[in-house]
Amino acid sequence: MNFKSLDWGLFLILVAALAGQASLTMAGPKQPLLLPVIRQTSSIDCGLAALAMLLRDKASITTSVAALVNLAAVLVDPTTARHRREGYSVSELQTLAGAFAYSLQARNLTLEAFYKRSFPLIAWIDPGNGGHFTLVEEVTATSVALADPTRGRLAIPSNTWRELWLQKTTGIVLELE
């Protein structure tokens, strides 16, 4: 190997990979690299798991549910900390994203506007248990691909997605900016 002609960025990646600190994975244009689903660790931290995946996938920030729980203990006002009983609110997730110098924008979208968004994004769905945050990875004409903190990676038929996501005529998404 001729090190004089080797690109320095590639060289550093190669050194890190050889040292076991990174992995080199080549994905073709039709085969996106699917990163592992970050699972929720309790019944109330789906929002934290979805935020951890969104930070990783959109901003290359690696964090964990446990780290976000610890961060919330510092940043979230304990007098309004409903998350200990009911899970994290949109406002609390926005506060946590702000700690990483990112803005988490909540939007009410029609189904048509949802299909035009840039993915991944967090969606709030109601599977009948009072609400749940999940990461939407990709949308096609027939299905919605999720990295779900509870159930793992799955594809939901479009008609089922409409029932889970739409609250009358709009649904809620959270986008990292």
Segments and roles (model prediction):
Residues 1-11:
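N-terminal Sec-pathway targeting helices
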Residues 3-4, 17, 41:
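Residue-level recognition of hydrophobic positions within alpha-helical transmembrane segments
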Residues 9-19:
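Bacterial N-terminal signal peptides
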Residues 20-38, 43, 52-57, 62, ...:
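Conserved active-site-adjacent core of cysteine acyl-enzyme catalytic domains
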Residues 46:
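Active-site-proximal loop/helix segment associated with metal-binding centers of metalloenzymes
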